[in-house]
Regions:
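Solvent-exposed, well-ordered amphipathic alpha-helical segments
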Residues: 221, 250-251
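Solvent-exposed loop segments of extracellular immunoglobulin-like
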Residues: 208-216
Length: 251
């Protein structure tokens, strides 16, 4: 079954005290396919798909702007870690990680649009942007210092809402157009049945399908089985396609 909801997601990772790992990392993904990357070692935004080279034909300054955006985010998250440390009663060096993700979703059938933005600190939820109200909600008391800062800047929050529901969607559609032959392709799976022993569950394995939106079910006649079935996750293959399985308990 083909997905109709497309996504553009940005992932930022800012750490302190983590050895042998970039202090800052940014990854951009379209429909869960990585399209660009930047980190504090290279300090340069770079494409991760060949078709992303097409962007500069229409926009020669694209990669310079992306690099500037990512490096600006690094400075922002540097400051946030320093602001948060006292709130969590943290002193000295130590290992600390600030992560954030934001982006948008677009349904190419219903045309419905959604946006999201959230941040986490040391592996726990910290802030979440409420799109409809255009406000930040703190997931824990220590995040209030950042939440208040956001609420005081109402214009900035409205600007974020506009970005997530307009500009982000504009770029999502643009990336989909650039990578249409890859992102919008369809590949059917090969399907096999596996059983270790006569008393073992029978596993239905489907692999090699693209895109990754799919369902796999066992049926008895027209009835879909649920209680007897243990479904597996959709997992990526090395060649960019996907696989999934569902085990049927015969006992």
């Amino acid at each position: 079954s083909l997905p109709v909801t497309h996504t553009l997601k940005y992932f930022y990772y800012r750490s302190s005290g983590v050895p042998n790992f970039p202090e800052f990392l940014a990854v951009v993904m379209v429909d869960d396919v990585q399209i660009s990357h930047c980190d504090s070692n290279t300090r340069r935004a770079e494409p991760r798909q060949e078709w992303m080279e097409k962007v500069t034909a229409d926009d020669p300054q694209y990669w310079e702007r992306e690099t500037a955006k990512f490096l600006d985010a690094q400075q922002t998250y540097n400051a946030r870690i320093e602001i948060l440390k006292p709130s969590f009663n943290q002193t000295g060096a130590g290992v600390h990680v600030y992560q954030s993700t934001y982006g948008c979703e677009w349904d190419d059938e219903t045309k419905k649009i959604n946006g999201f933005s959230q941040g986490g600190y040391d592996g726990e939820d910290l802030l979440r942007f409420k799109l409809k109200e255009a406000i930040c909600a703190a997931a824990k008391p220590e995040a209030e210092i950042l939440k208040r800062s956001g609420d005081e800047k109402k214009a900035e929050m409205e600007s974020l809402k506009y970005y997530l529901t307009h500009e982000c969607v504009y770029w999502l559609k643009k990336y989909l157009d650039y990578g249409r032959s890859s992102l919008m392709r369809t590949e059917l799976p090969s399907v096999s049945l596996l059983q270790k022993e006569p008393s073992s569950p029978v596993t239905c394995m489907a692999t090699g399908f693209y895109p990754g939106g799919a369902t796999l079910s066992w049926r008895r006649g027209e009835e879909e089985l649920h209680e007897e079935v243990e479904p597996g996750e959709i997992l990526p293959n090395p060649d960019g396609t996907f696989q999934m399985s569902a085990a049927l308990d015969l006992s």
